[in-house]
Amino acid sequence: MVAAAISTTDPRNPPRDRPQSLTNNGGQRRPRGKQVPSRYLSPSPSHSVSSTTTTTTTTTTTTSSSSSSSSSAILRTSKRYPSPSPLLSRSTTNSASNSIKTPSLLPKRSQSVDRRRPSAVSVTVGTEMSAATKMLITSTRSLSVSFQGEAFSLPISKKKETTSTPVSHRKSTPERRRSTPVRDQRENSKPVDQQRWPGASRRGNSESVVPNSLSRSLDCGSDRGKLGSGFVGRSMLHNSMIDESPRVSVNGRLSLDLGGRDEYLDIGDDIQRRPNNGLTSSVSCDFTASDTDSVSSGSTNGVQECGSGVNGEISKSKSLPRNIMASARFWQETNSRLRRLQDPGSPLSSSPGLKTSSISSKFGLSKRFSSDAVPLSSPRGMASPVRGSAIRSASPSKLWATTTSSPARALSSPSRARNGVSDQMNAYNRNNTPSILSFSADIRRGKIGEDRVMDAHLLRLLYNRDLQWRFVNARADSTVMVQRLNAEKNLWNAWVSISELRHSVTLKRIKLLLLRQKLKLASILRGQMGFLEEWSLLDRDHSSSLSGATESLKASTLRLPIVGKTVVDIQDLKHAVSSAVDVMQAMSSSIFSLTSKVDEMNSVMVETVNVTAKEKVLLERCQGCLSRVAAMQVTDCSMKTHIIQLSRIPITSSLTPQL
C-alpha cells in the first residue's frame, strides 16, 4: 500500500537531514514544524492540521542501522549508522545491539520531546565508500519486477489495541523536533511483543548489519549526507519528476503516468482476506494537498497519504526532492476529491466506477506501486529534468517497510487527526484482515506467524545476496570480456605476423625450388654440351644434304618452269597426278619384272669385271716377259755372231805362213 503522507513525520522513524554544508542554501536549516497557511485549500476540521503543515525533509545518502531498547518507542527513535556493506544485517536481540551503541552519537533524550535542539552530529559516509562499493550498494537496492505477485492475506487474529503511556527514555536523533503522537503510544505499550522479531533491533556500529527490512528502509545515494527514514511515498516523490501532462489514477492502485516509462512499481490492488471470508479489499490512494503554492528547493514539501478504502492503512512518505514544482491547486483538487471519495455519503464513494479519478499532476517519471507479497524497487537512476541529477534506486527493504506499515502506525488519534477520513480508516483497520504488507508492525504485536515473516525476510536477504552475486558476476564478466578482447587482439596480431612469416617462407620456398630446377637443368646440359659443340660441325653436312634432297625433290616434281603468275586448276592437277600415279604403278610392274634380269646382268658384269682384272694382270705379266724375251734375243744374236766368228779363225791361221 502506498504511503503518501509528508505533512507530518513519523517520530518512530524520523528523517535525518543533511549536514549544513549539503543543505539547499548551504547555511542555516529551516524549521521542520513551520506552519504556512494555504491560499487554495479549503479549511477542513478533519485535516486542518495536516493540510497546513509542511515539513522540510531531505533524502539520505547512505544506509545505516541503529539499535533500540526493549520498548518500541526507543526502537523507532534510534539513530541509524552507515554500513560499508550493501547487504545489511541486523542484530538478533535488542539488548545486544544496545551494548554496541556509541554514546556520542546517541545522547540521552529528555522527557520533553517538544524542545528543539540543534544537533551538531552528522554522519556522512558518502566519501568513505569506494566507487566499487557504491556500485555494489546500488546494485543491491532494487528488486526486480519479476517479484510481482498476487497479494494474499494471513489467517491472523486481531487483538484489541490498548493505550499506554509512552516510554520516558527516548534516544535523541539529529533534527528531531516533533513530539510523539498519541497513535505511537499505542504501539509503545507492548515492548514484550517487539522482542519476538530478532531483526527489529539495529546495530549502532559501522559493521555490516542488516536493517529490519520489514520496518526500516535503505537509501544508498551518494549525493545525500544524512540518514533518513525510508518510506515509499517519499521515495516515490523523490523519484518522480515534473511533467506537463501526466496523470494519476486513484482506484486502489497509484499509477503515475509520467512520460511513457515502462518501469513501474505496483502497490497492489487486492488485499485478500481469509479464504473463509472470501472478501477482497482494494487500496485507494490519495494525495493530500500541499499548503504552499509550490514545492521546490527543499523549502516546504507536499504531503502524500495513501488511505485504504477498506482497511485504511496509512504510512508516511518521503518528502519531495528539491526543485520539484507541484502546484497547490493540484494538491487541493486531489485532497477534495479524496475526501469526497472517503465520505460514505458522497456519490464518489458509493459508485465503484467513480473511485478512479484522473488527476493532472506534474510528475516526470512513471511509477506504479503494487501491494503484492514481494516488494518492488522504484526504477531510479534517471536524471531529473529540473535538477539534472541522478536518483538512486530504492532499497528492497525500504519498499517493504513503507508498504508494510501496520494499521496502528497509520491511524490517527483523536488529538492528532491527519485527514477527514482517519476515523473511518481506524474502523476499517480494526475490522478487516491486514495485508501481507503489514508485517513490520504486526509482528511487534505477535499477530503474524514468525515463519512467514522469516520467509519474507529471508527472501529479501537472499534477493540482496543474489543481487550481490549478480554484480560480482557482471564485474567478473566484464573483466573476462576485457581479457577476451585483449586475447583476441593478441591472437589477431599473432595471426597477422604468422601470415606474414608464412608468406615470406612460401616465397623463399618457391625461390629455392626454382634454384633446384636450374641446377638440375645445368647438370643435365653439362653432359650434352660435347654433342652440342659437335653439332655445329655436323650442321654443315646436314644442311648440304638437306639442300641436295630438296633440290632433287624439286627437280623430280617440278619439271615445268614456273615463271610469273601461274594459275593451276586443282581438279585438273589432281587428275594429272592420279594418272601419273597410275602410269607409275604400271611401270612398276614392268620394272619389277626387269629387276631380275638386271640382277642377272649385274652378276655377269661382276664376273666380267673379275675376268678383266685377271686379264689385266696377265697382260702385265706378258709385257714383262716380252721385254725379257727381247733382251734375251739380242744376247742370243750376239752369241750367235760370236760363235760364228770363232768358227772361222782356224782356217785363216793355216793360210798364213808360219814365220
Swiss-Prot record:
Ranges for region Disordered: 1-125, 157-221, 291-317, 340-359, 371-429
Pfam families the UniProt entry points to: QWRF
One GO cellular component term: microtubule
Polar residues bias locations: 90-102, 206-216, 291-303
UniProt cross-references to InterPro entries, sorted A to Z: QWRF (IPR007573)
Motif (QWRF motif): 468-471
Residues making up the signal peptide according to the UniProt record: none
Compositionally biased intervals (Basic and acidic residues): 172-190
Comp. bias (Low complexity): 42-72, 345-359, 401-418
UniProt record similarity statement: Belongs to the QWRF family.
Name recorded for this polypeptide: QWRF motif-containing protein 2
Gene: QWRF2
